[in-house]
Regions:
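N-terminal anchoring/stem segment of glycosyltransferases
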Residues: 1-63, 75-77, 81-82
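A structural signal for short, well-ordered beta-strand segments and their strand-loop junctions
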Residues: 40-41, 83-85, 115-120, 153, ...
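A broadly used, surface-exposed interaction patch
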Residues: 58-75, 82, 95-96, 101-104
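Short beta-strand-to-loop acidic/aromatic patch adjacent to the donor-nucleotide binding site
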Residues: 81-91
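Conserved donor-nucleotide/metal-binding helix-loop-beta segment in metal-dependent transferases, i.e.
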Residues: 95-125
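Short, flexible, basic/aromatic active-site loop/helix in glycosyltransferases
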Residues: 129-144
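Catalytic core and acceptor-binding pocket of nucleotide-sugar-dependent glycosyltransferases
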Residues: 146-196
Length: 196
């Protein structure tokens, strides 16, 4: 199966940041051509379109829902095993390495314990699987900010598992790592270079 049929791109935003959408999607279109990949824009109530991209806006049932509820609602619209998560201010500056994304999906297909590949650089004291995933390190559960809101390729079911309806992104980054520390089966991989 084509790796693009296994992923959805989820851009998380809010109505108040709609002024970021045109620059974000201008550079998105310039530096990435994710053929046949669903692109979802998670926001409260506004709709948005951009020439040359098929963007589906996802809105919560209640626009006053907390961020966590909005995130879970958006994730419920994803029908693929993997989701690439981005925030509206993660502006692309270079061409996205689609071959690397395809390799990541292959690695995740081959090891169900991998929860995600994060594109954030981290100083990891231990790499449990040296050179198994070139350009990435496996970081220990419970490491500070093991899970965070940086650009990442997530196993959709695991991302849903780690979210709670009443949390903000900042609370999620802090408190979810406590949950991750208890889960000894999930593997978390963080980049030593940026792909997005």
């Amino acid at each position: 199966m084509d790796p693009n049929q296994k992923i959805t791109i989820l851009i998380n935003s809010c109505d108040n940041y709609e002024d970021l959408w045109v620059p974000f999607f201008t550079l998105f279109k310039k530096y990435w051509d994710p053929k046949d990949v669903r692109i979802l824009l998670n926001t409260e109530s506004k709709d948005f379109s951009f020439n040359g991209l098929s963007i589906e806006c996802i809105h919560p049932k209640n626009i006053n829902d907390p961020y966590g509820a909005r995130m879970l609602n958006a994730l419920s619209h994803i029908r693929t095993p993997y989701v690439i998560t981005l925030l509206d201010d993660f502006v692309l500056r270079n061409k996205v390495d689609q071959d690397l994304i395809n390799r990541i999906i292959g690695w995740m297909d081959n090891d169900n314990r991998i929860a995600y590949f994060n594109c954030d650089y981290t100083k990891t004291f231990i790499d449990f699987e040296v050179n198994k995933y070139p350009g990435f390190k496996r970081i220990p559960n419970g490491n500070e900010y093991t899970l965070n809101m940086q650009a990442a390729v997530w196993r959709t079911k695991r991302l849903i598992h780690y979210w709670r309806p009443n949390v903000s992104p900042w609370e999620w980054e802090c408190f979810t790592n406590l949950c991750a520390a208890k889960n000894k089966t999930d593997k978390f991989n963080r980049s030593v270079k940026f792909i997005l």
